[in-house]
């Protein structure tokens, strides 16, 4: 039997507004959570990989606009996340796919956003928004299902600036842990036969690495482990003395917000 999963994107349609601090506004409809959120407006030109973007700790504090016109067509799955939760403050798209169809999908994008209290807005002229941000630069913004356009602009103007915010501290691991996650081998599975994929065999770990978590992505950890490193992940505030006491062969500094 086929393992293809197709989920209808059923969600409550509510009018929503995206407002920028310079007074520019865009109308649309919300999906996922409702309410009001603020963050720095930015854009991403990737044609795929929206789940990785949403869960990338580098986007903490930001409202991300996707320039690709159709988003959500393959749903959300457990393997593609870059962290344990979403980090975007809001998500702006042109059109939400009416169907999420993939044998790997476990829930729709609106369901995922509802679960994690993330506000999405669709129906926005993302081309016009992106051109505006490209020329004017990143700026504070607000998405709301409950404020007027003028109120949303004021909310954006009164929101916190990115400068001086310690997004690393809030997103770093609170406990030291060893990474032992496996990597999928997507060339082997045959979905039509019910086989949903295999994991690559992990090689023997020959070297010990300590990785500072400044907003590290799971895929970085997967690649390090897959290439023969035993990886211990530590909080961003861990002292050099504590690191040296672990006697590592190397130290890895992750990227982050």
Question: Where are the regions that the model predicts?
Answer:
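Glycine-rich beta-strand-to-loop/alpha-helix junction loops that act as flexible
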Residues: 253-257
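RNA-binding accessory domains that recognize and position tRNA/RNA substrates
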Residues: 12-246
């Amino acid at each position: 039997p086929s393992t293809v999963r197709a989920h209808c994107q059923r969600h409550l349609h509510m009018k929503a507004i995206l407002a920028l601090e310079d007074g520019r506004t865009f109308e649309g409809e919300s999906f996922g959570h409702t309410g009001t959120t603020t963050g720095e407006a930015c854009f991403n030109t990737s044609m795929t990989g929206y789940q990785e973007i949403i869960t990338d700790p580098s986007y903490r504090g930001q409202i991300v606009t996707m320039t690709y016109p159709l988003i959500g067509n393959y749903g959300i799955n457990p393997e593609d996340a870059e962290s344990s939760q979403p980090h975007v403050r809001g998500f702006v798209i042109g059109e939400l796919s009416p169907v999420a169809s993939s044998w790997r999908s476990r829930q729709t994008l609106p369901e995922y956003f509802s679960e994690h209290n993330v506000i999405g807005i669709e129906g926005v002229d993302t081309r016009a928004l992106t051109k505006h941000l490209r020329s004017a630069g990143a700026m504070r913004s607000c998405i709301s299902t409950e404020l007027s356009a003028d109120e949303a602009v004021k909310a954006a103007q009164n929101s916190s600036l990115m400068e001086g915010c310690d997004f690393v501290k809030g997103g770093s691991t609170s406990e030291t842990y060893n990474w032992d996650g496996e990597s999928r081998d997507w060339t082997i599975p045959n979905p039509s036969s019910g086989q949903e994929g295999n994991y690559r065999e992990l090689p023997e770990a020959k070297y010990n690495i300590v990785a500072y978590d400044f907003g590290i992505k799971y895929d970085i950890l997967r690649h390090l482990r897959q290439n023969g490193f035993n990886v211990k992940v530590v909080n961003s505030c861990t002292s050099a003395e504590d690191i040296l006491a672990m006697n590592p062969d190397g130290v890895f500094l992750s990227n982050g917000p």
